[in-house]
Amino acid sequence: MPFDPLFLWETFIALLAGIPLALKLAVFSIAVGTVLAFSLALMRVSRRWWLDFPARFYIFAFRGTPLLVQIYIIYYGLSQFPGLRHSLLWPFLREAYWCALGALALNTAAYSAEIMRGGLLSVPAGQIEAARACGMARVLLFRRIIIPQAIRQMLPGYSNEVVLMVKSTSLASTITLMEITGIAAKLISETYRPVEVFACAGAIYLTMNFIAARLFALIEWSLWPERRKTRRPVDLADQKGELHV
């Protein structure tokens, strides 16, 4: 098939229409999932089994099953229960957008909870004990000691989860949502040129994730002053402790 720059350009422009929906799914699912994940992480680090066990089971279930299966269960499966069809949740569960958003949020919460749990457990126990010895209240302890250090530790892993969620929005096309991949599938059925269409779609996802990765890199740079590269080369005198003005 001959190379057609005009077709690529027209395809690229057509796929841009799916970016707003993809971003809405990614941003809102990450926001909801983060709130749920923080609650799950606190339950996981709790010493009470009746808090730890439900969180552990939730994380196991959603990490151990494919996201596509979860989307299908929520969109196609829940509608077979008469109680749900007559409940206040039905106006949301009958809409593909809310089903996709819910599945994405529940899925990312399971992964993010483990990332947050690792960040919380990475805080040195000595600092926590010292803060308690100084009479620091639990809320203040979390706000000034635990949370700032936990955020720094979990940020690299959390940035990877955000990138994965941006790509996972493509699965929303399986339940009729016309985001980037949904529009791409429609164009392929009309043009029978899957290579060019999916190449354009992949370029859009790559650009979106590049921007997201750069934003997280900027946040990491601002949170780790000691990791910033100095503009002036460090010479031998500096290493010996001499100060140059």
Curated annotation (Swiss-Prot):
Residue stretches making up the ABC transmembrane type-1 domain: 19-216
UniProt keywords, alphabetically: Cell inner membrane, Cell membrane, Membrane, Transmembrane, Transmembrane helix, Transport
GO terms, biological process: amino acid transport
Transmembrane domains' residue ranges: 12-32, 57-77, 96-116, 163-183, 199-219
One Pfam match: BPD_transp_1
InterPro entries per the UniProt record, alphabetical: AA_ABC_transptr_permease_3TM, ArtM/GltK/GlnP/TcyL/YhdX-like, MetI-like, MetI-like_sf
GO cellular component, one term: ATP-binding cassette (ABC) transporter complex
Main location: membrane
SUPFAM superfamilies assigned: MetI-like (SSF161098)
Topology of this chain in the membrane: Multi-pass membrane protein
Nuclease among keywords: no
Compartments it resides in: Cell inner membrane
GO MF, one annotated term: transmembrane transporter activity
NCBIfam families: HEQRo_perm_3TM (TIGR01726)
Protein function: Component of the octopine active transport system probably consisting of four subunits: Q, M, P and T.
Family statement: Belongs to the binding-protein-dependent transport system permease family. HisMQ subfamily.
PANTHER family found in the cross-reference section: ARGININE ABC TRANSPORTER PERMEASE PROTEIN ARTM, MEMBRANE COMPONENT OF AMINO ACID ABC TRANSPORTER
Protein name: Octopine transport system permease protein OccM
The organism of origin for this protein: Rhizobium meliloti
Record lineage: Bacteria, Pseudomonadati, Pseudomonadota, Alphaproteobacteria, Hyphomicrobiales
